[in-house]
């Protein structure tokens, strides 16, 4: 028996929270098994044939159009929009900001940290999340695929990078006795700051690609409501959202791609398109970590293949090696970028002070 050919445009491949299993069955049983049939058919005709509410049909068509449509824009107008709406955010790491053009992260762009296991991708992600929360009072969504997010480690980085500097300034201005009297009050202030920083970072545990797709869809739908100026109490967090961290994309997508897993490849493409759409439409920074695989020349390269390599605007490679039995040296450089020079290397220390 010949294997049935798959085009990747079957409705079932694009099942989401809106396009539920029940709706998929109704589409398939009433002559709409393919995406193009849904997009090019009249919404009221679909409603009559499938008995799906017209509001749901319209919403499904709109979401599918976001994935498959390409609207041309004027180049000069695009330049003006970019110049007006782009915002820069420091990563909290001075040399990393210099590596990224001198201004740190740029809103609406996708950054990918690539490296072997235990090379420091999660540490940099937490450090950048910490700085955006502490310096800009921004909200961050941290999507964790391996329970790597560690609040105690975040507090340790906070104390090392910020509180030590503040105490040094206080010691220069105050006498030792006055500093000892105020130590208890300072500890309380420090604890309040840490709690506020942690409160602005929302962590989601995610262990498969479908959950990731649903999370991104929720972010998109919530931000679209806010952009229409209809905020609710639950959406206040998203109003101040500036960064989404995905740690790690390789863990989520690697099991579903490769070989004859056609559906997995299209799921990856759906996720990549949604990430690009959210980043560009709502000017959200995406910081994504990825694993490495062996290249042809015994050099490591980013996992997930060439199709995924076109997703990030900037790809940063992290290397680490042992100089002797005790010392481990890590370095980071830009492997690929749409606008930044590559191959500039600098060293990382224990507390990510470059």
From Swiss-Prot:
Matching InterPro entries: DNA_recomb/repair_Rad51_C, HRR_RAD51_Paralog, P-loop_NTPase, Rad51D_C, RecA_ATP-bd
Binding site for ATP: 115-122
PROSITE patterns: RECA_2
GO biological process assignments: DNA repair; DNA strand invasion; double-strand break repair via homologous recombination; reciprocal meiotic recombination; telomere maintenance
The UniProt record lists the keyword Oxidoreductase: no
UniProt entry tagged with the keyword DNA-binding: yes
Pfam entry (one): Rad51
Record-linked SUPFAM superfamilies: P-loop containing nucleoside triphosphate hydrolases (SSF52540)
Cellular compartment(s): Nucleus
GO MF annotations in UniProt: ATP binding; ATP-dependent activity, acting on DNA; ATP-dependent DNA damage sensor activity; DNA binding; single-stranded DNA binding
Main localization of the protein described in the UniProt heading: nucleus
Keywords: ATP-binding, DNA damage, DNA recombination, DNA repair, DNA-binding, Nucleotide-binding, Nucleus
GO CC terms: microtubule organizing center; nucleus; Rad51B-Rad51C-Rad51D-XRCC2 complex; replication fork
Top-level lineage group: Eukaryota
Function in brief: Involved in the homologous recombination repair (HRR) pathway of double-stranded DNA breaks arising during DNA replication or induced by DNA-damaging agents.
Family statement drawn from the similarity comment of this UniProt entry: Belongs to the RecA family. RAD51 subfamily.
Name by which UniProt lists this protein: Probable DNA repair protein RAD51 homolog 4
Organism: Dictyostelium discoideum (Social amoeba)
Name of encoding gene: rad51d
